[in-house]
Amino acid sequence: MAWKKIAEKGEIVIGKGKAFKIDNKQIAIFNQDGYHAIDDLCVHQDGSIAPGKLEGDIVECPLHFWHYNIKTGELKDYLKDVKLATYHVETRNDGIYVDI
């Protein structure tokens, strides 16, 4: 894996998420008690979770309301043992980096 700059500081509003494409992966970065990165792909019907509503560590897919933990990637309802990939995030002087 390698660290890649994905965003500028302040680009992702507190309490919100934003989708980014990097190395052919669609990644959602959430700014909720720090930055958290997970695959931006709901396993239900491949919708983007980045614009979903955040409540604590849980994001709700805006298409059909499935819920994922933004820190662990774990699906919180409907199917057991389903997780989206998570990625380490670092905030540096020149921006936000993800280990892809």
Locate predicted features.
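N-terminal pre-ligand scaffold of iron-sulfur
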Residues: M1-G56, I70, K83-I100
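Short cysteine clusters
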Residues: C42, C61-H64
